[in-house]
Amino acid sequence: MTNIWKSHPLMKIINNAFIDLPAPSNISSWWNFGSLLGICLILQILTGLFLAMHYTSDTTTAFSSVTHICRDVNYGWIIRYMHANGASMFFICLFMHVGRGLYYGSYLFLETWNIGIILLFATMATAFMGYVLPWGQMSFWGATVITNLLSAIPYIGTNLVEWIWGGFSVDKATLTRFFAFHFIFPFIIAALAMVHLLFLHETGSNNPTGILSDSDKIPFHPYYTIKDILGILLMILVLMLLVLFMPDLLGDPDNYIPANPLNTPPHIKPEWYFLFAYAILRSIPNKLGGVLALVLSILILALMPMLHMSKQRSMMFRPISQCLFWILVADLLTLTWIGGQPVEHPYIIIGQLASIMYFILILVMMPVASTIENNLLKW
């Protein structure tokens, strides 16, 4: 009798992707984040579905419906906080996943990398729209500030913003459409993630050395299934510590004040995972320039394959590049800190220096370091 896993059309796909998949024997825990992101996405879709059953997307009742979920719905509070903090876990895993790709040269899988960038943009858009839904002060003003950035686009900007708003300000129409988009986007993300995986399985996984590992492959199951389960358990542990002990640690207290168009909060800032980009945006005193820098801060990832000057794929054996990589990480942490600070001295200048440093590191210093390393190795 033939094995159903290998003969059935659907089972065959699952088998080739998660069971009999040939995987490098030496991939480290940095390769766990793909599966963690998958779990995050499933968790977000499930908790989001249950929240959507009780949420109302009308400006008069949105805030109250979230309160109702937390107070009156059975286990509504845990579903709400798992969804809110699940987004933070999602972005932690995303940043680690992208960082791994940069460090080990995974960006040389062009299709996989480019779909990953689209996934990153889609996830950021989804998180932004989700933050608007509770209709607190930061929801309303965050939506106003970020959507208003599109007015910097020459000629069509103002019309574009009013079209997105569905009026002359962020109002009922905006909230309703954001809810609709926030609901549909995760399914688009799931579909894109499957394409991401499809392209990855065309080439096989990279590994820490960056050397071709075709001669030394092991089956995905049981080796990496058990490794992924360990990663998932650790992630759920961290998530539940957040949810059960400090659910509001990463949130903004201003979002517990219902949205009021007549009262601006003293410091408008997005969720922590957007602060690095927000700091870059604020560093440029010109609206259009800021918006361009904001988009380029993520889109610069698409240039990584072209900026790869090294004869080696991974940074594992490239100490100069390693130093620059960790300086880049420190720079991004600095930008994240600055994004949450008020616009005043000395934060302005620190933010500007960190923003310049970010682009110089990626566009100039890393390619130069790669070339130096090639020469040191007489290549």
Swiss-Prot record:
PROSITE patterns: CYTB_CTER, CYTB_NTER
Co-factor binding comment: Binds 2 heme b groups non-covalently.
Coiled-coil region(s): none
Keyword Chloroplast: no
Gene Ontology MF terms in the entry: metal ion binding; ubiquinol-cytochrome-c reductase activity
Major location (coarse): mitochondrion
Segments traversing the membrane: 33-53, 77-98, 113-133, 178-198, 226-246, 288-308, 320-340, 347-367
Amino-acid positions noted as binding heme b b566 in the UniProt annotation, renumbered to this chain: 97, 196
Residues the record lists as binding heme b b562: 83, 182
Keywords: Electron transport, Heme, Iron, Membrane, Metal-binding, Mitochondrion, Mitochondrion inner membrane, Respiratory chain, Transmembrane, Transmembrane helix, Transport, Ubiquinone
Residues holding a ubiquinone: 201
Cofactor(s), names only, from the UniProt record: heme b
Compartment(s) of residence: Mitochondrion inner membrane
A GO CC term attached to the entry: respiratory chain complex III
Gene Ontology biological process terms, A to Z: mitochondrial electron transport, ubiquinol to cytochrome c
Role, per record: Component of the ubiquinol-cytochrome c reductase complex (complex III or cytochrome b-c1 complex) that is part of the mitochondrial respiratory chain. The b-c1 complex mediates electron transfer from ubiquinol to cytochrome c. Contributes to the generation of a proton gradient across the mitochondrial membrane that is then used for ATP synthesis.
Record-stated family: Belongs to the cytochrome b family.
Subunit structure: The cytochrome bc1 complex contains 11 subunits: 3 respiratory subunits (MT-CYB, CYC1 and UQCRFS1), 2 core proteins (UQCRC1 and UQCRC2) and 6 low-molecular weight proteins (UQCRH/QCR6, UQCRB/QCR7, UQCRQ/QCR8, UQCR10/QCR9, UQCR11/QCR10 and a cleavage product of UQCRFS1). This cytochrome bc1 complex then forms a dimer.
Identification of the protein by name: Cytochrome b
Originating gene: MT-CYB
